[in-house]
Amino acid sequence: MPCEELEIVWKNIKAEARALADCEPMLASFYHATLLKHENLGSALSYMLANKLASPIMPAIAIREVVEEAYAADPEMIASAACDIQAVRTRDPAVDKYSTPLLYLKGFHALQAYRIGHWLWNKGRRALAIFLQNQVSVSFQVDIHPAAKIGRGIMLDHATGIVVGETAVIEDDVSILQSVTLGGTGKTSGDRHPKIREGVMIGAGAKILGNIEVGRGAKIGAGSVVLQPVPPHTTAAGVPARIVGKPGSDKPSMDMDQHFNGIHHTFEYGDGI
């Protein structure tokens, strides 16, 4: 996301916060502490993450110091967060404000905390990265390994129960609903987790297991168990999953259409993909 777009997102957030504070005086101090007193999105993010992830072992002031260190070293993380905010605002019909993900949505919070953990992991500070992973799991019920590779423009919708394994890859503009697992198939080490390409939508409760690719613009139906690669621009569903059609757009993650080309299928156990 270009810098000017990042600034536009932040200006929208500040304007919304001022209107919200005027509309609901009981929350005015909350909006001031979380949004209005901050000069930029990075400052607001560091404050929010620090307070969400604080514990007796590592208080908020210490976590905020780590977050601010990461943002100073890699400002692209803030731009990625703005892309994630824009993704949620665009794709989730229940979200009508840019400020909502930053204030309230744990999928967004978990994703931004992952980005800090990923930076720490790549810097060799793996003990702290794993500590933050645990705090995210305890606080948000989302378990993302800090070594996983995740792009921008990501929506983790509802987010409870999402698991992303160590060698998983999630490219840009992907939407993932609650209780999705991107997991391995056993105790084998090495590259063992799914690769989710750009524009994919993964429905609630889907399990994608093993070092397999879900191709660009594919759609995975809710509750599916995917054990084989999914070709680009196809829809896979069932237990085990099989190809049932094609999405209605190049990037199903953007339109979030849960239907299969308007056809209502009755699923049976099949031969898989």
UniProtKB/Swiss-Prot annotation:
The EC number(s) given in the record are 2.3.1.30
Keywords of the record, alphabetical order, are: Acyltransferase, Amino-acid biosynthesis, Cysteine biosynthesis, Cytoplasm, Repeat, Transferase
Q: How does it assemble?
A: Part of the cysteine synthase complex formed at a ratio of 1 copy of this protein and 2 copies of O-acetylserine sulfhydrylase (cysK). The complex reversibly dissociates in the presence of O-acetyl-L-serine in the absence of hydrogen sulfide.
Q: What is this protein called?
A: Serine acetyltransferase
Give the classification, highest ranks. Bacteria, Pseudomonadati, Pseudomonadota, Gammaproteobacteria, Enterobacterales
Task: Offer a single GO CC term for the protein.
Answer: cytosol
Is-annotated flag, keyword Acyltransferase?
Answer: yes
Pfam families recorded: Hexapep, SATase_N
Q: Could you mention a single GO BP entry for this protein?
A: cysteine biosynthetic process from serine
Could you say which protein family the record assigns here?
Answer: Belongs to the transferase hexapeptide repeat family.
Alphabetically, the GO molecular function entries are: serine O-acetyltransferase activity
Origin species: Salmonella typhimurium (strain LT2 / SGSC1412 / ATCC 700720)
Its predominant location is cytoplasm
